[in-house]
């Protein structure tokens, strides 16, 4: 009985520390900033529909997508999933708080800024690299869930009009049929992202030295790195909630 009491006491004392680690990890890994960059892209997508839709339909689209991707709600869903999926956040937190981790996050945030996206709207420049650097990038391409996360972001932005129409005209997109179309789009986007993924990673992490890039790949391929990136992908999916009705989101 004493051992059980001690175990429960230890769990009570440890849980707030782990929760605090998760909050710190969420910020250190750049999640709030990336969500802000996503909202910038969402606003740009809304503007593209302004002149092609009737005013009432356009306003419904804006209202619906703003509700769906409300910042606090996206953060809440993503953080809850990260908390549920990542058993021990300490190793990932240590990495992202390190000088290299901060440099990785800075590179990723720079790549998703709206001015960078506008500059590269017609495609990224072809990056030349040594065979050794290409080898490390290949390892990173396998370790990072870039295809999957990129597909979710693309689907979320592209789906604002369809989601709004579905809310205005219930039953417009049948459940099973809609899910089948969504899965097909997801696979197609993952394939498209994968075709140029190595060059994309070379561009994003171009300011990392060869040694830093290798250290990053070592973390990403480690058990702790794999655990974090698997949890991160689940958190992206939970935060964006592609395929879920806006009315069903919490």
Spans of features found by a protein language model:
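Sec-dependent signal peptide recognition
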Residues: 2-7
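Surface-exposed patches in mature extracellular/periplasmic domains of secreted proteins
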Residues: 37-38, 89-94, 104-107, 151-154, ...
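N-terminal signal peptide c-region/cleavage motif recognized by signal peptidases
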Residues: 13-17
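A cross-kingdom marker for long, charged
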Residues: 187-191, 195-250
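Extended amphipathic alpha-helical interaction segments
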Residues: 112-206
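N-terminal Sec/ER secretory leader and immediately downstream segment
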Residues: 19-116
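Membrane-interacting alpha-helical segments
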Residues: 58-75, 172-198, 240-244, 250
């Amino acid at each position: 009985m004493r051992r059980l009491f001690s175990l429960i006491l230890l769990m009570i004392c440890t849980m707030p520390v782990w929760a605090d680690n998760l909050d710190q990890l969420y910020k250190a890994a750049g999640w709030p900033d990336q969500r802000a960059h996503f909202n910038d892209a969402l606003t740009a997508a809304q503007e593209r529909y302004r002149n092609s839709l009737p005013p009432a339909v356009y306003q419904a689209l804006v209202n619906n997508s703003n509700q769906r991707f409300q910042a606090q709600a996206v953060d809440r869903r993503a953080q809850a999933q990260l908390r549920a999926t990542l058993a021990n956040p300490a190793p990932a937190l240590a990495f992202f708080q390190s000088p290299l981790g901060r440099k990785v996050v800075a590179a990723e945030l720079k790549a998703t800024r709206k001015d960078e996206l506008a500059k590269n709207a017609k495609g990224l420049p072809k990056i030349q690299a040594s065979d050794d650097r290409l080898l490390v990038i290949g390892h990173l391409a396998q370790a990072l869930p870039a295809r999957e996360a990129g597909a979710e972001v693309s689907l979320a932005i592209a789906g604002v009009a369809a989601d709004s129409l579905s809310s205005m005209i219930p039953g417009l997109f049948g459940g099973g049929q809609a899910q089948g179309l969504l899965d097909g789009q997801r696979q197609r986007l993952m394939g498209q992202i994968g075709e140029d993924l190595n060059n994309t990673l070379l561009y994003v992490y171009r300011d990392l030295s060869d040694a830093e890039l290798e250290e990053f790949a070592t973390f990403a391929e480690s058990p702790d790195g794999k655990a974090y990136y698997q949890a991160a992908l689940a958190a992206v999916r939970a935060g964006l909630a592609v395929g879920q009705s806006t009315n069903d989101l919490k």
